[in-house]
Design a protein with these regions (language model features):
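N-terminal cap/lid segment of alpha/beta-hydrolase-fold proteins
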Residues: 1-21
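Active-site glycine-rich loops that stabilize anionic/oxyanionic intermediates
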Residues: 26, 33-37, 105, 234-235
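Conserved alpha/beta-hydrolase
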Residues: 41-70
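Alpha/beta-hydrolase active-site loop
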Residues: 75-93
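Alpha/beta-hydrolase-fold enzymes
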Residues: 111-194
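Short beta-strand/loop motif that positions the catalytic acidic residue
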Residues: 230-232
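Conserved alpha/beta-hydrolase "acid-adjacent" motif
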Residues: 237-247
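Catalytic active-site module of serine/aspartate enzymes centered on a nucleophile-bearing elbow/loop
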Residues: 255-294
Length: 294
């Protein structure tokens, strides 16, 4: 296995892309990290996949990671910019093997937008969620107006109200305990200078708008009939404790022939970082390579 770093450009933006390259790759996966984290957190997953003959491509999304200027951490102007970056990075994937997308949390929303563009041979949607209620519609409208007034402002109270007020579902004193039942992972996340940052009003507005957008039936109907693998924690409050994944499986199943769901018991939002993560990695490998062998 080799790790190769390269710089790509999307107009005036430099994108630092990392490839995990096996000696004889059988498939390739483009990974999209979640909100308020960065690509380096995924080293263990990427190493495992590469050691099992899966080529991996990852980069930091706008407003995230040490590549970003400090004043821009937690901010991006448009979800369309995230999609544009993703398509640039996609071009670096080898074209002679099956190409998959894997997105976690906010990254799953990016992936679900991209699925309408017929890029991938399969999709692994991890830790996704929905905001289907009337109060979510009101929140979307409120954030849209606020983003016109103070787009770059990062309000702690607004971040908690929008996405991060889930700790109350779990006993304990650790901040962000809703992410993971493994306390050591929570400690690492909370001590990471590039994880857990507040997002700007504009970024929150764009994220919420697109969470609601990707649930529209007319958007889902634009997908192609490729394999879909939905993965989440049964104790994840963002997915309403797995309900959103079950609803998405039903909706996809109305139109597409292969839709699989893995709801991991006792796992919270960051299912790829839970105590049983290696078992989850192994199931991802099997699912991808089963496709490659057909």
């Amino acid at each position: 296995m080799k790790i190769i770093n390269r710089t790509m450009r999307n107009k005036d933006r430099k994108i630092e892309v990392t490839h995990y390259v096996p000696a004889s790759p059988k498939a390739s996966i483009q990974i999209f990290h979640g909100m308020a984290e960065h690509k380096d957190r995924y080293r263990e997953l990427l190493t495992y996949l590469a050691l099992n003959d899966i080529h991996c491509v990852i980069y930091n999304q706008r407003g995230h990671g040490p590549d970003e200027k400090k004043e821009k951490l937690g901010h991006f102007d448009s979800f369309e910019d995230l999609l544009s970056d993703a398509k640039v990075v996609f071009r670096s994937m080898p074209a002679d093997i099956p190409r998959f997308g894997l997105g976690h949390s906010m990254g799953s929303i990016v992936l679900r937008r991209l699925l309408a563009d017929d890029l991938y041979d399969g999709a692994i949607i991890v830790g996704t969620g929905s905001k289907p209620n009337f109060k979510d519609l009101l929140s979307e409208k409120f954030l849209k107006v606020l983003s016109l007034i103070i787009p770059r402002k990062k309000l702690t109270s607004l971040n908690k109200l929008s996405f991060l007020g889930y700790d109350g579902n779990f006993k304990g004193r650790e901040k962000n305990r809703w992410l993971n039942q493994d306390v050591s992972e929570i400690v690492k996340y909370n001590s990471d200078p590039y994880s857990g940052q507040n997002m700007s009003v504009k970024a929150l507005s764009e994220i919420l708008k697109n969470i609601r957008y990707v649930d529209r039936i007319r958007h889902i109907r634009r997908y192609k009939d490729i394999p879909y693998y939905l993965i989440g924690g049964a104790d994840d409050p963002f997915s309403h404790f797995g309900r959103d994944l079950e609803v998405l499986r039903f909706r996809l199943g109305l139109h597409y022939s292969k839709v699989d769901l893995m709801l991991e018991p006792n796992a919270r939002h960051e299912v790829l970082f839970e105590e049983n993560k290696v078992g989850i990695y192994a199931r991802i490998v099997k699912w991808v390579l089963d496709y490659e062998e057909k």
